[in-house]
Amino acid sequence: MSAYRKGNIFIISAASGTGKTTLVSRLLANHNGLRVSVSHTTRPPREGEANGVHYHFVSKEEFESLIAQEAFLEYADVFGNYYGTGAEGVNALAAAGYDVILEIDVQGAAQVRDALPEAVGIFILPPSFDVLAARLNGRGTDSREVIQRRLSKARHEIEQSVLFDFVVVNDDLARAEEDLRHIVNACRLKRSRQLGFIADLLENS
């Protein structure tokens, strides 16, 4: 966290099964000054997921009440479940100088970029569709029909990667994490993100 600058907002998107969640977890564990935005969802928790840590798990009625209050930067219905990013928490973290990660889908990323043009978009690519299919099958949580739908959707999502600022291929977890760290560090060093430090330096010269 820096006392001199507003934090960056990083949008990290990927097709389902690309390893985005694992990469983000590793990045948060090994990189200081980063916070993740905890999304709201109406889907049931998976094994090992905790409310308020991985997601805010809410009912459909609660989610739709938040929509009516315009509480989300973005939200979407994904395979019958709502997902959304709360605006208040993201803005508070960035204002405090933290870099904020939004781990959201392509549709949500477009909504956030419209609302926050300064946000940095990063898209995670699988090394191949064969690897992606194997990862989805390996989860053991979805039917064959759902997996085929996810693969079909993945092709469309990967086509949308041209709208992002950076792409990272997750063929090796450690290397992909290192690529993400380089992106975060480079964005922190942008002149536009160091104006507070520069002004303070000149004032005290």
UniProtKB/Swiss-Prot annotation:
GO molecular function: ATP binding; guanylate kinase activity
Domain of life, per lineage: Bacteria
SMART domains for this protein: GuKc
Major subcellular location class: cytoplasm
Protein location: Cytoplasm
Enzyme's top EC category: transferase
HAMAP family the record matches: Guanylate_kinase
Function: Essential for recycling GMP and indirectly, cGMP.
This protein's name: Guanylate kinase
